Amino acid sequence: MPEKGLAAAILIGGRATRMGGAQKSALTIGGVAILDRQLAVLRRVADPIFAVSSIEGPTVDGLDHVRDRFPDHGALGGIYTAIDASPHDRTIVVACDLPFLTVRLLEHLTSIDADLVIPRSERGYEPLVAVYSRRCAEPIRRRLERGALEAQALPRAWMEPNASEGVTMAEIGPEVLRAYDPDGLLFVNVNTPHDYARANKLVERGSKPSRDRIMDELGS
């Protein structure tokens, strides 16, 4: 059952020039569209689910569509829009190019009481698989207005002493993440044709437990 008082936003992004203009959420991984994979997971933890996009174009079937309030400001503008447009105090924000999200991880993130709950993988903070409260909106808006656009810099800044801007933050480090990501797939994204081919190969070559876990998330 979705958690009460929790929404989810999928950031559709811009023109996907590195993918030749293809709509990344419509790409298929293992024969299933990335968007369908994400919806199968998000519907089990959040309601409603809506899309945020910075460009005019086709809307995502069945989802409310919100126009990015800070176009050309990168992912941080989409994060702000998602928080500001959400009907609930807490919102899961995910990028549209992450095909391997899991219910278990999102349930863990949403169980933690903080204004920002964010994974920190081996490569750093993952601001596009995180839970934000409405309290994050105003500090993010101020950063956008002064041109501080790097999404990963946000949690780094808030972790500094006396720099939290009144926002509480909890990070989920690599040691904890391993329990939710034994096959190392969670934060694989699809930004380029190379990424797309790699993601499909990961599914094709994955172990049987990995394939079973992915299909279980889809309710198969």
Which stretches of residues belong to each language-model region?
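SAM-dependent methyltransferases
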Residues: 1-7, 193-220
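Nucleotide and nucleotide-moiety/phosphate-recognizing core
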Residues: 2-151, 156-186, 201-204
